[in-house]
C-alpha cells in the first residue's frame, strides 16, 4: 500500500536500492539475511494491487505478502494491534474479473503458518481472523459509515477493514501464487486514526514489517531446502 512503508521495509534490507518509482508504484529490491526480496508500494485499492502482482510475477515473483494498515470493528481492538488475515469478505470489484464472488478470498496456508510462526518467535502479540476489503474509501455503505453494515460485520466477527487483500488472495489463487497478509490497526471500533494512537500504530507497523520479513525468509529457505 503506502509508498513510505515500502521504503521502511527496504531499509531493513542489507543492500536495498530503488528499482523504479513510476505510475504510482515505488519498488525496492535487496537482500534480507541473505534472501533476495522486493518491496512494492502499490497505492490504494484492488486495481493497482492486481497490476503489481501480474507484473512482479512476470519478473519471477511467486510469493506475495501484504504489509498494511486497517480499521477495526471488535470491542477491545486498538491502534497498533497486529492482525494476521485468515480470509477476507469480498466487497471489492477487481477480484471479480478473475474469479466469481462465490470463490473464497483466503491466503495460502504455508504463508499464513509462517507469519504466525514468525510473530510467535519474535514475541509479537497478534490476532488472526477474517476481515473485509472493498474499493470505495468514502462509500456511504461502508461499515464505518452505515450502521446496518457495521452491525453485520461486528456480528460476523470480522476483525479488519482495508482495500487490497481480497484482490491479493483471489488473484494469487487464480494464478497459483502464494499470498498472505497482515495489518497494523490504525484505530478503534469508534475512532478512525485517532491522534493519540499514532505512536502505537507506528509500533504496530514496525511489528508487521518484522513479521513479514521473517516469514518471507522462512518461506524462501524452505524453498531452497525442498
Language-model features: where?
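Metabolite-binding pocket within alpha/beta catalytic cores that recognizes anionic/polar moieties
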Residues: 1-114
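Flexible, glycine/charged-enriched surface loops at secondary-structure junctions
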Residues: 15-21, 123-130, 219-226
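Short acidic/polar active-site loop segments enriched in Thr and Asp
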Residues: 62-63, 159, 178
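Active-site rim beta-loop-alpha module in soluble metabolic enzymes
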Residues: 105-155
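Generic non-transmembrane alpha-helical segments
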Residues: 114-122, 171, 211-222
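Zn-dependent metallopeptidase/amidohydrolase metal-coordination segment
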Residues: 166-200
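His/Asp/Glu-rich mid-to-C-terminal helical/loop segments that flank catalytic regions of hydrolases
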Residues: 189-226
Amino acid at each position: 500500500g503506502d509508498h513510505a512503508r515500502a521504503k521502511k521495509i527496504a531499509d531493513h534490507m542489507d543492500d536495498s536500492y530503488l528499482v523504479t518509482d513510476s505510475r504510482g508504484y515505488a519498488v525496492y529490491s535487496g537482500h534480507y539475511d541473505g534472501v533476495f526480496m522486493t518491496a512494492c508500494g502499490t497505492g490504494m485499492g484492488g486495481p493497482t494491487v492486481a497490476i503489481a502482482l501480474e507484473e512482479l510475477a512476470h519478473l519471477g515473483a511467486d510469493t506475495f505478502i501484504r504489509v498494511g494498515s486497517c480499521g477495526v470493528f471488535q470491542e477491545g481492538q486498538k491502534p497498533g494491534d497486529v492482525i494476521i488475515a485468515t480470509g477476507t469478505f469480498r466487497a471489492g470489484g477487481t477480484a471479480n474479473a478473475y474469479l466469481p464472488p462465490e470463490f473464497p478470498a483466503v491466503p495460502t496456508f504455508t504463508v499464513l503458518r509462517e507469519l504466525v510462526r514468525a510473530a510467535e518467535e519474535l514475541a509479537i502479540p497478534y490476532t488472526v481472523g477474517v476481515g473485509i476489503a472493498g474499493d470505495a474509501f468514502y462509500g456511504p455503505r461502508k461499515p464505518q459509515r452505515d450502521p446496518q453494515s457495521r452491525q453485520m460485520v461486528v456480528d460476523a466477527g470480522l476483525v479488519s477493514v482495508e482495500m487490497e487483500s481480497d484482490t491479493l488472495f483471489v488473484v494469487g489463487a487464480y494464478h497459483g501464487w502464494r499470498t498472505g497478509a497482515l495489518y497494523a490497526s490504525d484505530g478503534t471500533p469508534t475512532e478512525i486514526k485517532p491522534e493519540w494512537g499514532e505512536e502505537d500504530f507506528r509500533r504496530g507497523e514496525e511489528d508487521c514489517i518484522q513479521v513479514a520479513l521473517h516469514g518471507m525468509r522462512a518461506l524462501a529457505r524452505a524453498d531452497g531446502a525442498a
